Amino acid sequence: MAMSQESLTFKDVFVDFTLEEWQQLDSAQKNLYRDVMLENYSHLVSVGYLVAKPDVIFRLGPGEESWMADGGTPVRTCAGEDRPEVWQVDEQIDHYKESQDKLPWQAAFIGKETLKDESGQESRTCRKSIYLSTEFDSVRQRLPKYYSWEKAFKTSFKLSWSKWKLCKKER
């Protein structure tokens, strides 16, 4: 059986709920959904899918605004309604953001270059790592000056298993 070699996108692994379906989920199910979507996204990033974190990860559900605005407060709630699950999840997102620096899947791959780690020590790698954040501006600032923003994102970020093995042998 021949398998397709098409690239996956976040939409391919994204589960969409109707507003009615979303409202029937309890807070534990909503948290599980968020965790699974974050994991799906992290897997795509780990294989070279370079894009800002989709807003859907930081949303309560279809038709609702992002959970976080400037400073991490919910953007929209019903008038006079306290939404404790929003605040609870907001705290979890803060914890997640704090732990992001420790997660290996944050790196996306740009090209073969010599890198300097945070201590300034050079190392030869097969792909240049760019550490992602939830904002494109942060990624843009970390791109080398000789990469144009447009060129970097039009470039294919596919890294086949055979190339990966070859890179490991070169180290």
Curated annotation (Swiss-Prot):
Disulfide bonds: none annotated. SUPFAM superfamilies: KRAB domain (Kruppel-associated box). Gene3D superfamilies: 6.10.140.140. InterPro entries: KRAB, KRAB_dom_sf, Krueppel_C2H2_ZnF. Expressed in brain, ovary, testis, prostate, tonsil, heart, bone marrow, colon, breast and kidney. One of its GO terms (biological process) is regulation of DNA-templated transcription. Residues 8-79 form the KRAB domain. This is KRAB domain-containing protein 4. It comes from Homo sapiens (Human). The gene is KRBOX4.
